[in-house]
Amino acid sequence: MRRDLDRLLNEGVNLHRRRFVTGLSLGGAALGLQPFGLLAGRGNEPGGTTLQGRVFNLTISQTAVNFTGSARVATTVNGSLPAPVLRWREGDQVTLNITNLLPETSSIHWHGIILPSAMDGVPGISTGFNGIRPGETFSYRFDVKQSGTYWYHSHSGFQEQTGLYGAIIVDPKEPEPYAYDRDYVVLLSDWTDEDPNDVYAKLKKLSHYYNNNERTHGDLMRDLEQKGLSTTWNERKMWGQMRMSQRDLSDVTGFTYTYLMNGKNPADGWIGLFKPKEKIRLRFINASAMTFFDLRIPGLKMTVIAADGQNVEPVTVDEIRLGVAETYDVLVEPADNAAYTIFAQDIARSGYARGTLTPHLSMTAHIPSLDKVANLEHRDMGMSMHHHMDHGMPDAGHSQPNMPATMDHSQHNMPGAMDHSQYTMTDRIKQMAPNSSDFSTGPVNHAATEYGPHVDMLSEDPQYRLDDPGVGLRNNGRRVLTYADLRSLHTTRGHPDPDREIELHLTGNMGRYMWSINGVKHADAEPLRWKLGERLRINFVNDTMMNHPMHLHGMWSDLESGDNYFLPRKHTVIVQPGSRISYRVSVDAEGGWAYHCHLLYHMLGMFRTVIVS
């Protein structure tokens, strides 16, 4: 990377190969010697430009940038970070000609877009697609069958971490259900000056390398004063036995990350203009590699109108947690001639991205302080609240216990897969209220492949916690959006009941930085084989203390939220630590599909290939 940077800075920037924002002069900024935020446009053009139409020509290349005072090399589209906003129209066929000027293979995945497998952009998994080799052009062509807010990013190596991501807006062919005066993309991301390969290597050697919020002697003294010696001792003993940290909230933090909003660092900040009493649509996109953001606009209520591009019944909140790869659309209506800060702090409270909604460029708003760092609780370990703190977790290396007869894996052809393919759900659903969801609160079973040194935690009592805002947001005095608030704007009454269900456990060993599904990493796992036309119920159990944003390519995930008549539709679902969650999938897309945790440094292990035939 250093050699690439020297080449770019010494040779200058070839604008034929690395196109900067239209109209930028060949000065210091063009050489990457100024903060790259200067290259980004204002308003709804976070990457400096919005491209609209049916045919798009995009070039992937290396571009010199500077977010921190040190020049680095980014992976960009048309010389822009974020990449240009792509604006499509529902019902159109779009063609995207992607030219790769990198010295390595690249790709682009259209996140949340329903399209043929061959156009999905995952090398080695998407049907017939092996990536875009250096110097080559690949043409994506597909019909746009949906509307809403989405995004695109590389699915090759760590290119997403180095800048290859951008927003997609799909305008509906029918009139929108909501009126607004302004329309802004607010794209959040995380940037590191380090080579992502070095970041990953450090995590493999010391998983908490970037955690600067470990508990201190001062925390111990406060606990002794507030909880007493016995409770404090038992609590500390429990965490010590598990060799886990109560503040293990995020693998990579502000210790190395600079958090960006529309390509602007916190010092510069993004700016969106408005006139008082205008209604503004904000399209929030979490395009980060590893960061969960907790977002609020002090002084303004946000009315959520869409989740992952799909319209939902309006719900008014103060704060939203954006998991990696999620999108939320909100409406805000500033009544006063005043400025407001868009404040997005990371889940570990190590930094923030920010922007300003303002009537005038000269007006600024107060920037809030970071919230206090939260501690993980019993519920985040999948433990019952009455669990005695003197009970240590099982030794990760203990022998496999006798499995109940119902968990006989001898007939399974997938390592560790709990595919109840012969289990019909008709009787269960008939016993439920006509429009209610079964939240799978029964006993949890662990596959034989979960036992061993590669898995350091098993949830004993994972709960379905749709109404839990999550660690750091509980009881904070603000109205926080939860999945329980999401209700589809359109009925799902006619959707069929599931034919069968599959249980997937999210597993890992934090100390060794090993991630897997059902205790099996992707390289050792057989594909999940689904039948075209069937309706599945996916049950996730999180056997780790991390949030995992699970993304299924090519098909919608209908979240079981309590009302089967209005199931919210998502492309990325957050599985909270020590919890369980379920959704329904109509298997309507033939071919090969990726299914994975969207935390970039988890993806090598917590990943499955899905084959639909």
What is each stretch, according to the model?
Residues 1-16:
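N-terminal secretory signal peptides
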Residues 16-33:
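N-terminal export leaders
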Residues 120-125, 130-132, 234-395, 409, ...:
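Histidine- and aromatic-rich segments of cupredoxin/plastocyanin-like copper-binding domains
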Residues 36-44:
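Signal peptide processing junction and immediate N-terminal pro/mature segment
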